[in-house]
Amino acid sequence: SGNKKLLLSARANSPRVNFCSSTPENPAQPPMFCMLLRKRIGGGKLVGLRQNGCDRVLMLDFECVNELGDTVMIAVVCEIMGMYSNIIIVDSNGVIIDSLKRVDLTMSSKRLVLPNIKYELPESQNKLNLLECTALDVCTAVKNLDTEMPLNKALLRTIEGVSPIVCREIEYKVMEGATNKIEGVLFDRL
């Protein structure tokens, strides 16, 4: 409760959304997108969070007051997808007000991210949602991949919303567990 500092980052090497206790130093001349965010949601109240499954797209719903004094809903869409990360401001009709990174036809033939067009979610990758599947479902999907690849890469292609670092950690834990079991069996036989 109370006011909190919200950090939104679309940097390719560290995209994230989180509350922070310290206030980062602001640049002397804020970027245009920052000024637009301040204008549209400054003083607004965060009233909802939405996410499609476990996909790495988070929608922050703000109740704000516009220039005319009317209460309006504005969504700030945070697409946390590595080098394709973006932050998009969307009005209550689902129309893009603006985005940190504009995407036109020269950059993508699949999806435009430009002012005054309807916002569309990134194309589904048809991965497994960990909240709706079992460990057996994941194992089966990994086993059914048609190529041989390291476990961390197979997990990344199979599970929705996980980052490469999480997949590497899962692979490490699986290998550590397998090594401990093998060592235990060998010790028991000695």
Question: What residue spans do the PLM features occupy?
Answer:
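Phosphate/anion-contacting hairpin/loop surfaces
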Residues: 2-190
